[in-house]
Amino acid sequence: MPRPGRATAKILALIACLQCFVVSGSLAAGADQAPEADWPTRAWPVSSPEQHGMKSGVLARLVETVGGYKQNSLLIVRHGKIVLDAYYAPYLPNITHDVRSVTKSVLSTLTAIAIRNGQLDGVEHPVVDMFSDKQIPDIDDNKKAITVQQLLDMTSGIAWQEKSFTPDEAIVRMYQVPDRTAFVLSQPMSDAPGAKFYYNSGNPYVLSALINRKTGQNAFEFAKKELFGPLGITSAGWGRADSQGVIDGGAGLSLAPHDMARIGYLYLRNGIWEGKQIIPSSWVDRAREGKTPATFGFHYANLWWSLPEMDAFMAQGRHSQLILVLPKLDIVAVMTGILRDDQFYPMRRLVDDIASAVKSDGPLPPDAVGASLLEASVREAATERPSSVGITPELVKQISGKAYQFSANALKVKTFALNLIDPDPFWEITTETENADRPTRRFSGILGLHGIFRMSPPANYGINASKGRWLDERTFALERRILGHSETQLWVLAFDGNKVEVSFEDTDGSKAKLYGEKKD
């Protein structure tokens, strides 16, 4: 499946972490015949799985299985109540999480609201007509024919590269120009509009620009008033607007897992919230049915993925961010994670694993043994297991507290220092900036040396968690995360006298080599 999000070389590392706990939900017949909902606008009600026809013992096994896939959280709602709420160490509850391309599905929801409000006149309107002030070369009949619906279905026909996130790809070049909307619409056409599915994060960027143009607000401002406010979503953050005032519609949104579940619950309840039709039920139906055949056996529509044969549809983001809606089971499931692109939990298996816990639409008898197993699984997930640390060499005395200065590099790292002897070991990096008033920027974090992540006090970029270990007598590995970000970062430092070679890698696929020398 195409990888949502972007992978630019980063200096921050990314993280996710700790703690788990369990709960459960109420009772009903399936979303299509659900009784009056117990709306979770202020807080999610919780209950035991058995009260809502699910087996705690099966969910306990699911918590353990999902934990093997480097997830940060797993949440399941049935009949409007949380029946499972687990967090994997070192991730913590209530931390806002980068949801990557789940952003697209939220942007779709905002498009539906703009149509409901009469601010956008419908999905069949030609897109280029609404940007007549843009300088768009080579406008042919195919480009003139692109509609809002085709942007929503990833069938715009615009030629696009979005796979490896290398500098030559359109997705990377888009972020380097001042007018990204014009950039997307200026790309050549590879197919007639509507003819073929092709994943293109430029499509939702143009939709976000339409939100600006038609509502007078950027997507985040519009969402706070029209979507997040009514649903009780309070955790949201959403990147920065570009020079045109447009928020990225393809990525950049952050939500806590409970707020992700609210988005899914809106769709489970056919667009209704507290008796008000927030989005048309037909919009939900189209996402659920998946009108457009996509990749890997999935379907796609309205910026949502679907498996129609399983009656499952989902918002998905890179590194395993997920809002899964199972209408016939009256279930919403949420996952956040830090997985590499080749490590996704198989979606069909996940649907089957969740469904296997459902035994009835009504309550089951209490199950003390199952409840105990589930409680233990959630507690175990929240407890970090120490990793190996290696033997501390004599070299530590020579490098600890010393700063190493680096030649020009892709990460713009100027200096790197490790303090491994202090009672509170820490690392420190300085990087170059393009700001003449502030030419360097400093990052630092407390470092766990006993196989456990240690958390630094919250910074403006989040909560840093780091741990390090010796691979051999001259090689030290530092793993760094920022809780709630969907990437992890690994720095491997190989020391040789006064010199150091640093190998950098993150889960976005960025890699770099840095060469430094000890400062006098």
Predicted regions and their residues:
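Active-site helix/loop module of the DD-peptidase/beta-lactamase fold
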Residues: 98, 117-158, 186, 215-251, ...
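Active-site Gly/Thr loop motif
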Residues: 235-237, 281-335
